[in-house]
Amino acid sequence: MASNSWNASSSPGEGREDGQDGMDKSLDNDAEGVWSPDIEQSFQEALAIYPPCGRRKIILSDEGKMYGRNELIARYIKLRTGKTRTKKQVSSHLQVLARREISGDSSKLKAMNLDQVSKDKAFQSMASMSSAQIVSASVLQNKLSPPPPLPQAVFSAAPRFWSGPIPGQPGPSQDIKPFAQPAYPIQPPMPPSLASYEPLAPLPPAASAVPVWQDRTIASAKLRLLEYSAFMEVPRDAETYSKHLFVHIGQTNPSYSDPLLEAMDIRQIYDKFPEKKGGLKELYERGPQNSFFLLKFWADLNSTIQDGPGTFYGVSSQYSSAENMTITVSTKVCSFGKQVVEKVETEYARLENSRFVYRIHRSPMCEYMINFIHKLKHLPEKYMMNSVLENFTILQVVTNRDTQETLLCIAFVFEVSTSEHGAQHHVYKLVKD
């Protein structure tokens, strides 16, 4: 790896995903897939208790552990009935119920005297919801009030782009606001005459489908971010050291059933990043526009490790691609929308498991960043830290060195974590509507 040093600008806790207490082992001799009335009742209760949360984890305050929603539903069924249902069975049951909801609502829509535009809007709203959201919307609606007329009965609202705060975290900064997705008018198609009728073209082969990680993780058509961390290491003796993660993103294995990333209007954050040549606005207009993401970190500053001689502050990141390229990674630290320092690193590909991997390992932080962290940690109140962080951003741009094509552009914004379980994050896809 070839890298340059930081250059000043001329401008001024991990939750387990794979089961709990042997949940995926024995099924207590219950027939797999059989949902008796007591299990179904507990399942419905759990749906109302644990709302859909996408790929986020839910922290149980009494245990301090993080669980996925399906895992919590399975635990609830076990506690209420003594019968075991795995999180995979819960997921399958959600999908079955979702298909029933869609089928039932489709029949009701046909029976009602709705115009074509209303039908299309209802199905469009239905298509944008995950199976968990479809089922939960129905459960909560039945519990709270008699269902109003369709199509609002089950689909009272399309999923919001800006979700609620992560448990244990303050709400999002007021200067980054959600935007409403405009309703696109759908014109009913004109029925073709028999003379012009042609059979539909065959579906494209599965091999040409969009990769599962695209639109669900920080990934463009050509490059995917696998890991990212900023950390501090303090040596304890000649062979060991203590490590603290300020921010961290670990590798994930998304599936097609996972929700797509929420969208954020890029114009809301233009003023937080440089506007001159090579700034965020110019980069987005140049495209490709599926390469732009907003990454909000709740940074963990609650370190008990004492800074001292030999302390190392660094950043590590890892990317993967189906193409063999040489990439250039530009990292710009910005204050009040102005670039303060920039570091440019060049990384070459290594073939691993039929994909090309790019690793930037233990890249040293610049002095500006180290001093900034020190001053931030000495502020007496969290709200003071967040006030400072409102004007602090980082812009990372990954390009193909040979073609200068933008492969990934990640805009970082920050708040201070109030959780006892370390750093957390949320990813948004930057769009312009």
From Swiss-Prot:
Source organism: Gallus gallus
Biological role stated in the UniProt entry: Transcription factor which plays a key role in the Hippo signaling pathway, a pathway involved in organ size control and tumor suppression by restricting proliferation and promoting apoptosis. The core of this pathway is composed of a kinase cascade wherein MST1/MST2, in complex with its regulatory protein SAV1, phosphorylates and activates LATS1/2 in complex with its regulatory protein MOB1, which in turn phosphorylates and inactivates YAP1 oncoprotein and WWTR1/TAZ.
One GO location term (cellular component): nucleus
Region: Transcriptional activation, residue numbers: 171-433
Gene: TEAD3
DNA-binding region(s), residue ranges: 28-104
Sample GO molecular function, one term: DNA-binding transcription factor activity, RNA polymerase II-specific
Ranges of Polar residues composition bias in the record: 1-12
Tissue: High levels in cardiac muscle, low in skeletal muscle. Intermediate levels in gizzard and lung, low levels in kidney.
Region feature (Disordered): 1-35
Record protein name field: Transcriptional enhancer factor TEF-5
Basic and acidic residues compositional bias, start-end: 14-28
GO biological process, one term: regulation of transcription by RNA polymerase II
Organism superkingdom: Eukaryota
Keywords: Activator, DNA-binding, Nucleus, Transcription, Transcription regulation
Compartments (UniProt record): Nucleus
Main location per the UniProt record: nucleus
